[in-house]
Structures are given as C-alpha cells and as structure tokens.
Design a protein with these regions (language model features):
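Short amphipathic alpha-helical interface segments
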Residues: 13-29
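Hydrophobic, repeat-rich solenoid/adaptor surfaces of innate immune receptors and signaling proteins
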Residues: 18-22, 117-125
Length: 167
C-alpha cells in the first residue's frame, strides 16, 4: 500500500498518525511502509536531496531505503515508524509548537516519560519552537523539569546569608 503526500508539507503528520494507529491496531511495535512523494509537485522541495531532508526530519520516521524513478519525478522511501517513538515525539512537538502543557502527573522516573522529556528538550534546542518563544519555552521547560524532579517531601532549597545553598 502506498501512502502519498502530494503537497510535501508538514501535514504529513496526519499520515504518520494513520501509520501509528495501524501499528496499534495490529499489535505491532514497528511498521514498514512505502512513503511516496512526487518531487516536482511543489517547487519549494524540487530535487531528491531536499525531499530526503524533509522526510528525514519528520517526527516518527526512520528511512530504511530510498529510490528515485528513472524520470526523477517520484521519490520512494521505505520507512519504519515506531509506536513509542512516534507518540513521544508527538507529545514533545505539541509542547513546543502548540504550547500544550506537560501533564502534571508526568513521572520522570518512568522511562517512557523520560523519553518524552528528552525529545522535548531536543526539539527546543533544534529550533522547532517558534523563534520569538524559543528562550521562554526553554526556560519554562527547564523549570518544569526541575519541579517534576523535586521530591515534594523535601524542603525547598534556600540560600544562607553568606550565599551557601542549603536544603
């Protein structure tokens, strides 16, 4: 089955979501699909090298193999998408681009949640957030990590008169 994103834009997340739901429905952890793009459809992404960079940047996809037809107008990627990775990246993207709050109950000791936090930080550092909000988002994220990582039973950190931190 070929999944075609003719516009070659970031609406491809809908395509990825379909793939992720198929994985969940079939009880698999990994799904391999053909991902087909018409190279010449959008002048912004003319050329296989640009399309390759675009597909490689899509959250949740890992390129296994690629090929271009003999006319150079269609580019086919064989991609793997991983269920846990996809959903972790999706949550991280929601936090960075849509300013969605991190779940208050997020437990940083849970390995899956820790992956979401790492990926969120990765997205902030790589410029996925809006430029005007990048620094503020980064500060908010670090503060959120700090708040989540603190044990509520411990007293807050204070500074003595001579500048020494104590708990």
């Amino acid at each position: 089955e070929k999944l075609v994103d003719e516009a070659v834009n970031f609406n491809a997340f809908d395509l990825l979501q379909q793939m992720a739901w198929r994985i969940a429905a079939e009880g698999q952890r990994v799904l391999r699909e053909d991902f087909v793009i018409e190279i010449a459809r959008d002048p912004r992404y003319k050329g296989a090298d640009r399309v390759e960079k675009l597909v490689d940047s899509l959250i949740g996809l890992h390129i296994v193999e690629q090929s271009v037809d003999h006319k150079g107008s269609w580019l086919t990627f064989f991609v793997d998408t991983y269920l846990e990775y996809f959903f972790a990246r999706r949550l991280a993207l929601d936090f960075c681009e849509r300013h969605a709050p991190l779940p208050g109950q997020l437990d940083v000791t849970n390995e899956r949640n820790f992956e979401i936090l790492k990926l969120t930080l990765e997205l902030i550092c790589s410029g996925w957030v809006r430029k005007e909000g990048c620094i503020a988002d980064g500060r908010d994220f670090v503060k959120t990590l700090y708040d989540l990582g603190r044990n509520p039973a411990q007293p807050a950190t204070t500074t003595t008169a001579d500048g020494v931190l104590q708990t």
